[in-house]
Amino acid sequence: MNGQSIPPGEGILHHAEGVDLIPANIELAGLEVSLVNTMNREKMLKQVLDGAKREYDFILLDCTPSLGMLTVNALAVADTTLIPVQAQYLSAKGLEQLLQTVQKVRRQINPKLKIEGILLTMTDSRTNYGQQIDNLIRGAYGSKIKVFDQTIPRSVRAAEISAVGKSIFQHDPKGKVAEAYRSLTKEVMANAEKQLKRVAERGR
């Protein structure tokens, strides 16, 4: 922000489960305003991550559910975006606006940006309402964008993890949410392998 370079490894925490984290803090809330008058504001995060990418196989950016400058920064540096959508009517309505933002970023900033898929979260298949939202999103977008078969169910145990400071795999390793994320990981990786095969076949 102030033109000073960031030392390598600054702010990175090494977690016992084998991942590195850069946690957010309360100051992030004011960063959105600070970016308004910043030169090259859409690529501030890219400048930081370009130096760190060589150290990692994958970097995951967890964005807030908003379409502000922080989210635009994440889209500007990302290779692909996985879009989580809560199984609620208002979240489903907001999906179209997010997709428009992705298209705009692709046109103006990051032409290589791809949509990995849509992930339904906090689902409850036991209720008619939950099934209706699932059908609504799959019906509206499933022909254009991959909607993952695996969903992430609503769970009290998952809601507890922020308070206990553990991942769902530590806190409730055999629970339905942990199992759902394992299944999702397999689905994402399988989808990526299919895409790589299609690219290889086109190149022959």
Predicted segments with their positions:
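P-loop NTP-binding core
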Residues: 1-204
